[in-house]
Every structure is written in structure tokens, then in C-alpha cells.
Amino acid sequence: KSPPQALNKPLPAPSAPSL
């Protein structure tokens, strides 16, 4: 089982810019 990308590369959602 490969590690989730969320833990490997925590990037903000480009689809929904909260900022």
C-alpha cells in the first residue's frame, strides 16, 4: 500500500482557493 499523497505532499486545493 503506497502512502497517500496528502501526507507525502500536503498541498492546498488549487480547485478551491480558500485564501
UniProtKB/Swiss-Prot annotation:
Naturally occurring in which organism (per UniProt): Dendroaspis angusticeps (Eastern green mamba)
The keyword Glycoprotein is assigned to this record: yes
Subcellular location: Secreted
One Gene Ontology term of the molecular function aspect: toxin activity
Tissue: Expressed by the venom duct.
One cellular component (GO) term of this entry: extracellular region
Protein keywords: Glycoprotein, Secreted, Toxin
Signal peptide: none
Key word Glycoprotein present: yes
Glycosylation positions in this chain: S15
The protein, known as: Pro-rich toxin 4
